[in-house]
Amino acid sequence: MKTSLRRLRGVLHKHESKDRRDLRALVQKDELAQASQDVEDMRDCYDSLLNAAAATANSAYEFSESLRELGACLLEKTALNDDEESGRVLIMLGKLQFELQKLVDKYRSHIFQTITIPSESLLNELRIVEEMQRLCDEKRNVYEGMLTRQREKGRSKGGKGETFSPQQLQEAHDDYENETTLFVFRLKSLKQGQTRSLLTQAARHHAAQLCFFKKALSSLEEVDPHVQMVTESQHIDYHFSGLEDDDGDDEIENNENDGSEVHDDGELSFEYRVNDKDQDADSSAGGSSELGNSDITFPQIGGPYTAQENEEGNYRKSHSFRRDVRAVSQSAPLFPENRTTPPSEKLLRMRSTLTRKFNTYALPTPVETTRSPSSTTSPGHKNVGSSNPTKAITKQIWYSSPLETRGPAKVSSRSMVALKEQVLRESNKNTSRLPPPLADGLLFSRLGTLKRRSFSGPLTSKPLPNKPLSTTSHLYSGPIPRNPVSKLPKVSSSPTASPTFVSTPKISELHELPRPPPRSSTKSSRELGYSAPLVSRSQLLSKPLITNSASPLPIPPAITRSFSIPTSNLRASDLDMSKTSLGTKKLGTPSPPLTPMSLIHPPPQALPERADHLMMSKQERRI
């Protein structure tokens, strides 16, 4: 009975000692876990402090460099001031910037002394604590490994495995406890000094800032009386609005609540949102206008209500969507008519625009019976010429493109001006080559000295200057059509006549004159007038020369009747086919130039109403 009680008492003592060891191990594990968390928190704190100190030092360096550049600029600009007092103040302000630069550099060095260096020292201490934590973890792993192997040996039946004596286990346990104690104690000491070290760093940094701003303020106050004196003498209010505003914080809070970013403190405003909306509206309007007119291939005339101030805006909008919208039109942009611009300025602008892009107009081949796209006129030319013949001539003589179909011309009841208009209008209707007309079918073309050239580019609706035409006239040969609607049969000529190029000719078509003699071909390219653009590009670009020398025209082949002059005026019987001096080789050129003849006698001031006086006799042509 006594033996059993002793055994029970011994078992109880063993269990109590085991429970104490387990409780001590749990306490050590909790302390190590808390110590590890404290190490991480301290590392994060010092890392953030070092980052802030580095950012402050970098900003101070940039501020120092900016002050140096500002001071150098002020010292360089002092030579521009004629006032001696102003120059002296600028020199003082420039030197002040250099003094502030030195103070900023000192403050930057104080940042390193007060924050960066102490924080790095504390981080080094923290690294030592982390190393102690690593050793403590190793000791714990060794002790726990020994205990695990000892237990496995007792459970195994064969007794195989490494055996440890109780002394070895006790030594391992003691080493682990010693390392844990040192680690926890060192960590607690470092944690208690963390608050003190942070307070020391902040106080020393405050002293550095106070020293910096005090010295900077004293330097600024030394220069302030001189600046104030100069500004008062020149009536300059250098204390701008908002400089000493006590309600600045309240305004910032109100603006944050309202979501507004605009301050009404007299500062400059860079608010462009309203302008952006207006520009977007204009762009959208311009885009819709461009899309609406994308299928228009010819210029349009602005209405009479178009204002002058809208010209530049419309011109800008016509180009705004050109990169984005692929329109069908390849013509020039639409130019509204400006009623206040003089016609001479319009002519100069149109001349410079057209002559810069185009050179000459190539006539189509005889087989082309339909109108080419480039020879279609603007709708604005339909109603030109009936009310005012002079304006119609000045508007239409610039273009070789065919105009719209007109009614039959009444030669016997029109004046000379109307005849000129009809000739020019009908001569532009067709560009195919026709048989030569009668030799006597010479008539006067338009009066004036304006250079008439043709272009294949877009036709604009701006009128030419309405200047009085000079009295000097030149003879041009061409038919006067009677019925532009009816068609004529193919003309047959004598076997000795030059071959003709006919493709279902109309009465309104322009007849081609025979090529002049070789001696007058070189001079004819420099004459002023043309009944159509019939010369090559190189000849058209040459500088025209005005000459009054006469050059006789050759006698064309005989034709039974004319297609452009009434039958009562025909003189086909007077033609002599044996004197034709042109061959088929010279008529092969696409567009021979026409040589105008100068008048022996001055031209009459007013011509009779009848078209019979427009004819010249055969004897005068042979002079």
UniProtKB/Swiss-Prot annotation:
Residue stretches of biased makeup (Low complexity): 364-379, 484-495
Keyword terms: Coiled coil
Stored InterPro entries: AH/BAR_dom_sf, At2g33490-like
Residue ranges with Acidic residues bias: 243-259
Coiled-coil ranges (or none): 24-51
Signal peptide: none
Record protein name field: Uncharacterized protein At2g33490
Organism of this sequence: Arabidopsis thaliana
Species lineage: Eukaryota, Viridiplantae, Streptophyta, Embryophyta, Tracheophyta
